[in-house]
Amino acid sequence: MRSKIWASTALAVLAGASGLAQAGTVTVLTSFPKELTSAYQKAFEAKNPGIKIEILNKNTTASIAYIKELPAGQRPDIMWASAPDAFEVLARQQLLQSAPDTKNPQAPAKIGNYPLNDPQGLYYGQALAGYGMMWNTRYLQAHKLAAPKEWADLARPEYFGHVAISSPSRSGTTQLTVETILQGEGWDKGWTQLLQIMGNAAAVTDRSFAVPDGVNNGQYGVGIVIDFFGLAGKYSGFPVDFAYPSMTAVVPANIALVAGGKNTDEAKKFMAFTMSTEGQQLLFDPKISRLPILPYNTLKAPANYPNPQEVAKRAKVQFDADLSEARYQVVTSMFDQMVTFRLKELQAATKAIHAADKKLRDKPNAKGTELLNQARSLAYTSLVGEANVKDNEFLEVFRKNRRDVAVSKQLTGLEEMWSSKARENYERAAKLAEQAASL
């Protein structure tokens, strides 16, 4: 009898020891804000006391580089971010691992016409996201500004100095927003609209969080953001509102198992939790305010909360993640050289163009109109044409490893040329607009 008791006890101890050996830390690499990650961390750890979630916060571009640089066995366990093209990059380089058992069968196959999950099963939609504009209602009232409805509204003269955006090279969600406009309007027309809006910008921030924070506290009037920034501000009680323009897209924010991670089995448990009914319900927390992947009849959604399927039906852009990924480096680099690093000159040109436009509306002048059109063309035309971004040889230059001395020299030369040309164009545009206003 004693031997049986001992044997049972020994087995229990061994089982316990085995459980302790399996229990450990799951490292989650993410660009998401603390309000979201901490909510999931606490809820999951409460259900799984033997597992600790470690959050490693980096922007999307830095996250990709981080995973690529680490050897197998030392990588984070999970990648969790909004940018679908980032997951395409990791999948193509065999840095993701399939985890089909983590999916929730209640989730739809598509959002609108966009697949929720990777067809190869390497990453999965965990939430949904659209892109639009948030604004501070008190700020707009104080400055007598109407709430914007479409991207084009932000290019109007009355919005000069009232708009904020983060740099797409530093924010994956902003890159998606910029790419959505470019895909919706077309390359050339899209850049014209972007540059007109950016001429009205008060700031281009380093991190995406700075834009909603600035709108929430009244520093900026309007922010170009991913939807959850605007919705989180609204449902947390700030005097803000949010709208999806017609030229938007709804795409999944994804979660994936990183190949060569340290704790695959327990990482899968966390992934499954984020897509479970309990995990999806967390998205309605006012500080999170994201769109779930599960149908609303399986959840308790707040009154008047946006329904992603309805937003997707109204959205005019069928987002092409492959196209976005192919020209990612070109778009982000161009934006920095034409906008981020030349904002002061672009603002000056835009201010002069607005002034000349007002003067010529009050007092029409053919020569002035001609000069103003020249100014607009100089200020609001992309330095790289659509033919270039369809050229694989041109795109390949930007895909190469920048640590290579020759590659770095080539790219730096291109970027310096763009920066110099942008400055020259903006300064010439300002002078032409001033001439137009003086006639």
Which residues fall in each region the model found?
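Periplasmic-binding protein-like
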Residues: 193-198, 235-261
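A bilobed periplasmic-binding-protein/Venus flytrap-type ligand-binding module shared by bacterial periplasmic
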Residues: 134-139, 250-264, 282-283
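C-terminal non-catalytic accessory extensions
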Residues: 354-439
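Mature extracytoplasmic/periplasmic domains
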Residues: 258, 263-266, 271-325
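Early extracytoplasmic/lumenal segment of secretory-pathway proteins
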Residues: 24-89
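Paired acidic/hydrophobic, glycine-rich loop segments that form the ligand-binding mouth/hinge
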Residues: 74-81, 204, 221-226, 241-243
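Extracytoplasmic ligand-binding site segments that recognize negatively charged/polar headgroups
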Residues: 35-38, 75-76, 81-205, 209-216
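A ligand-binding cleft/hinge motif common to bilobed small-molecule-binding domains
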Residues: 85-89, 216, 221-239
